[in-house]
Every structure is written in C-alpha cells, then in structure tokens.
Amino acid sequence: EANADASASGLVRKLDVDAKAWPMLAWSWKVERPVAKGDVTRRSGDDYAARVYVTFRVPPERLSPFERMTRSAARAMFGDDVPDAGLAYIWDSRAPPGTIVPNPYTDRVRMIVVESGSARAGRWLSYERDIAADYRAAFGEDPPPVSGVAIMTDTDNTGERVRAWYGDIALSRAPSVRKDSA
C-alpha cells in the first residue's frame, strides 16, 4: 500500500538487465481514485495515484556532450544512482491510454499513459508492456540496459490525497500466456 497526502512515496529496486533480452514488464496495481488535478502535460499536474518507472543507464557514447555534462553534474550532487533515461507507466486522470509525452521536468523521461480516469478505480488491474518497444517508440532508438524499476504514488504538486496498491512486478523474456486487463 502506498499513500500520498500532498507528498510522494516511492520504492526503487536497482537492477542491471539487458532490456532487449528481458523486454517484458508485468505488474498489477489498484487505486482508490486517480489524482483529480493531474495533468500529464504540466509540472503543476505531474502527480499520479500510481506509476511504475523503468530506468536506464545510457552508455556515454550515446549521450550528447551537453547530456554528459548534465549527467556528471547530477551524479556529483545526487550520487551514481541518477538514471540517464526512464519510462514512467502512469494512471492519469484524463489523457487517453497510449499517450506518450515527455516528463514536464526532464526530456530524458517519457510518460506513458496505461490507464486513465476513474472508471476502473477500485479494481486490481494487470498490465504487460514490451519495454524495448516502448523505449524505441519514446526515444527513437534501441534501449540501453535497465538500471532499475520503481513504484511511486505522489501528490506533491496538486496537494491531493490518494492511495494505491501494487502487486508483483516482473521482467521476462517473452509475453505471458495470461490475458491481461490492459
């Protein structure tokens, strides 16, 4: 269970995984309700009752000189765990599923709406995504190694109160045989 009351809560699991060899990400979650004032396109609305992040470590040769400088500065301030890129699978309040937009704080993270609105709130929902294909769609190139997976429930921008539950999260080599809800 994750709660946010004008705050944010998250949990990170560091990994070192080849995204092309282990491309399938499966998870389940349930929210009481989405963040009413959430807006995937604005910093003031960058809050979600549920999100699952996949972070990536981009080899230095794939970064521009400016990106390498920014990465060095970020790691000097925050340590080596600062990811180079990320995909955030979110439950938005209004954008339709399938929407992919840059995070309002950084262009190195893409927000991918997998659920929207309140119609399915209060129910456990399961998802399976091909993170390699999603990375290509979001960034236009093959994915680098996965450096971590995280969950986050946050309302620090909107000041709302939400609650979410997260089930198992797994990476696999091939799609599951079960029929997912999304």
Language-model features: locations:
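Solvent-exposed strand-to-loop "edge" motifs in beta-rich extracellular domains
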Residues: S28-P34, R57-P59, A132
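Extracellular/luminal beta-rich ligand-recognition
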Residues: D47, R51, F56-Y105
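Extracellular beta-strand elements of beta-rich domains used
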Residues: V149, D168-L171
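Extracellular/lumenal carbohydrate-interaction signature centered on repeated Trp-anchored short motifs
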Residues: K14-L25, S118-A121
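A short beta-strand element within beta-rich, extracytoplasmic domains
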Residues: W22-E32, S147-T153
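Short consensus segments that form the blades of beta-propeller domains
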Residues: T41-G45, E160
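Extracellular beta-strand ligand-recognition surfaces/modules
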Residues: A50-V52, D107-G117, A121-E160
